[in-house]
Amino acid sequence: MMVLEKEDGVPMLSVQPKGKQKGCAGCNRKIKDRYLLKALDKYWHEDCLKCACCDCRLGEVGSTLYTKANLILCRRDYLRLFGTTGNCAACSKLIPAFEMVMRARDNVYHLDCFACQLCNQRFCVGDKFFLKNNMILCQMDYEEGQLNGSFDSQVQ
């Protein structure tokens, strides 16, 4: 049997040897096609190898599949379930890839963490805020710092 490996090491395309036909892990029918797919040490028809979340076909040439926790997933669903967008600049905790975030320059924040770091006033989309020394500040705290001579202007 010939097996071609994908980048992530998951065997994908096999040429079925003459003789005993393999059973499809998706539909449980015999695979009579010359080509079959192999993922998670199981064999699949091209049409039966699908993402466990969104049912998109993964058997097409050029498709990439991801496996984790015995699930077969497309790239989008793998990142949605298991990916991260980095760490929150305020609390330093991981931010899951599917979670909505706020951004200020190169910093990424959980929605709940996007607040003035002096008075804890939360910001909404469109609110004016200031970024000074990687600190997010509301207008009142920023202006107070300006009056005291603490800050240079860095309006976002």
From Swiss-Prot:
**Taking every annotated instance into account, which residue ranges of this chain make up the domain LIM zinc-binding?**
22-84, 86-148
Q: Which InterPro entries match?
A: LMO_RBTN_TF (IPR050945), Znf_LIM (IPR001781)
Biological process (GO), any one: positive regulation of transcription by RNA polymerase II
Keywords from UniProt, A to Z, are: LIM domain, Metal-binding, Nucleus, Repeat, Zinc
State which residue ranges cross the membrane. none
Q: Name one GO molecular function term.
A: DNA-binding transcription factor binding
Give the GO cellular component terms, alphabetically. nucleus
Localization terms from the record: Nucleus
Report the domain of life of the source organism. Answer: Eukaryota
What's the stated role of this polypeptide?
May be involved in gene regulation within neural lineage cells potentially by direct DNA binding or by binding to other transcription factors.
**Which PANTHER family does the UniProt entry name for this protein?**
LD11652P (PTHR45787), RHOMBOTIN-1 (PTHR45787:SF2)
Name this polypeptide is given: Rhombotin-1
Q: What is the scientific name of the source organism?
A: Xenopus laevis (African clawed frog)
Q: Which gene encodes it?
A: lmo1
